[in-house]
């Protein structure tokens, strides 16, 4: 099954423009409810500066509504495709993998299908999203994956439990990066890696984010930007791979960032 076919199971589609979304909506979606129209008209978004409750309300609303789910997630199709390609290339050899902020499970289930020899745990703080993820797990007959409702700062697994931790634009919404990275460091094995792909497009914010990773005791072993296209617009996603071990060769963070922004 291709990535595009897989995401269609979650009503996530590859649109090239907002006009394509609008035309598809009129032809395929039922009439929105009053609450859905209010949500769409206000164009509410999850925001790193918002509190836990506000972001929970946002993702719960998306998790409850098929229309909102399809619209909001389809807008970022390109990011999901580029991120998944990068993550799958990085997961080879790891047996126990944690996916943080799994939403309705569209990426976690794809990883589990592509790497059946590994076991996956997907966590999200939205009950509605996790419920949908578990339903899709059953539909796909996946036995190497579990979805649970959990805050990323309260993951109650034994120390050094996971070989790999994957984050696709979720830690970015944490109110306290250092607290989150310190917590994740405890549950990552000595030889494991943390892959984080934050939704950050500003030079200084990327540097601040990486500084907090390093302050938590991680070393950066790979850092690069991957190109993606969302609704016809080109973007570059920072991909940061971290380890608890010192790298053989230090990554020049400023050089990588300046190469893109200058």
Describe each PLM feature range.
Residues 1-52:
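N-terminal auxiliary segments of SAM/dcSAM-dependent transferases
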Residues 76-93:
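Conserved alpha-helix/loop element of class I SAM-dependent methyltransferases that forms part
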Residues 104-116:
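Conserved SAM-binding loop of SAM-dependent methyltransferases across substrates and taxa
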Residues 126-128:
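Conserved SAM/SAH-binding beta-strand->alpha-helix loop
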Residues 133-134:
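Conserved SAM-binding loop
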Residues 153-165:
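A short acidic, Gly/Pro-enriched loop at the edge of an enzyme's catalytic core
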Residues 178-190:
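A short glycine-rich, Lys/Arg-flanked "PGG" loop and its adjoining helix->strand segment in the class I
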Residues 192-199:
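Conserved beta-strand signature within the Rossmann-like core of class I S-adenosyl-L-methionine
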């Amino acid at each position: 099954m291709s990535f595009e076919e897989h995401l269609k199971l979650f009503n996530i589609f590859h649109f090239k423009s907002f006009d394509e979304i609008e035309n598809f909506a009129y032809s395929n979606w039922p009439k929105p409810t009053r609450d859905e129209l209010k949500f769409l008209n206000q164009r509410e978004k999850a925001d790193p500066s918002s509190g836990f409750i506000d972001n929970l309300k946002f993702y719960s609303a998306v998790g409850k509504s098929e229309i909102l789910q399809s619209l909001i997630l389809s807008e970022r199709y390109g990011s999901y495709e580029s991120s998944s390609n990068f993550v799958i290339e990085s997961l080879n050899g790891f047996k126990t993998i944690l996916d943080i902020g799994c939403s309705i499970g569209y990426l976690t289930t794809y990883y589990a299908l592509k790497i059946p020899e590994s076991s996956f745990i997907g966590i999200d703080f939205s009950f509605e999203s996790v419920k949908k993820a578990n339903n899709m797990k059953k539909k796909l007959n996946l036995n190497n994956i579990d979805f649970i409702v959990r805050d990323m700062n309260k993951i109650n697994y034994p120390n050094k439990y996971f070989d790999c931790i994957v984050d696709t634009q979720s830690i970015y919404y944490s109110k306290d990066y250092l607290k989150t990275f310190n917590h994740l460091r405890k549950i990552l094995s000595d030889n494991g890696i943390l892959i984080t792909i934050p939704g950050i497009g500003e030079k200084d914010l990327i540097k601040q984010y990486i500084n907090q990773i390093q302050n938590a005791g991680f070393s950066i072993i790979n850092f690069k930007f991957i190109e993606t296209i969302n609704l016809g617009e080109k973007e570059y996603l920072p991909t940061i791979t971290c380890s608890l071990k010192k790298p053989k060769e230090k990554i020049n963070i400023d050089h990588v960032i300046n190469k893109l922004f200058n």
